[in-house]
A protein has these predicted regions:
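Extracellular polysaccharide-recognition and catalytic grooves
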Residues: 32-202
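N-terminal catalytic cores of secreted or lumenal carbohydrate-active enzymes
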Residues: 1-51
């Protein structure tokens, strides 16, 4: 997944360019790795410009990665491909539900993509569907801490899933927008992870 390559690329670049403190040996290793890693990221981004099939969540994930690659690497082709996808408009309705209604999985992937789009473009309008969805999700938490999934059109339908993968979204959006209810939700998710002995968040 190209998205998972980007944090490592940013780290290597920050060390190699001296934007982050590192000893000489680490800086040398990062400087050697950076062009190799950048070539991989560019190849992956180039492949994404050709798009193809895609459900709504794939489109937003691809558009967000392309926009971030444009921000980090330049390349007008990345932005052009992302813009073509974004012309379709968000599939998040006024209630905060995305088209696939996948509260147990794909809604949070859409949220991640919208957050990345906001960061990559500097356009805070991309936060709006995230806020609507996270607000809706506060009403989707069952008494046992799991998520209501019975209206999903995807494979999470009817499954018992806990909201741990929403943790960073609530934490980030709570901080960025100074929304105490989102920060409280992040704390409650962490407490639920502890209560149920769940694996740590990804």
């Amino acid at each position: 997944c190209t998205k998972r390559l980007l944090p490592v690329y940013v780290y290597l670049r920050r060390i190699a360019e001296g934007a982050q403190a590192a000893d000489a040996a680490e800086k040398d290793v990062c400087a050697q790795l950076l062009p190799l890693y950048e070539a991989i990221v560019k190849d992956a981004a180039e492949a994404l410009t050709h798009c193809g099939f895609h459900t709504p969540n794939h489109r937003w994930a691809i558009a967000s990665v392309l926009m971030m690659c444009h921000r980090l690497l330049g390349g007008e082709a990345y932005k052009k491909a992302a813009d073509a996808i974004l012309l379709e408009g968000s599939d998040c309705n006024a209630d905060g539900e995305y088209a696939e209604r996948s509260a147990g999985n794909y809604n949070r992937i859409n949220n991640d993509a919208m957050i990345m789009l906001a960061v990559a473009t500097g356009d805070d309008a991309y936060y709006e569907p995230v806020v609507r969805n996270l607000t809706m999700m506060l009403t989707y938490i069952e008494p046992d801490d799991s998520i209501f999934t019975n209206n999903s059109t995807r494979q999470d339908r009817g499954r018992k899933i806990y909201p741990k993968d929403y943790y960073f979204e609530y934490l980030y959006m709570g901080d960025v927008l100074q929304k105490p209810e989102f920060l409280d939700a992040a704390n409650e998710i962490m407490a639920a992870v502890d209560r149920h002995g769940l694996k740590a968040m990804d």
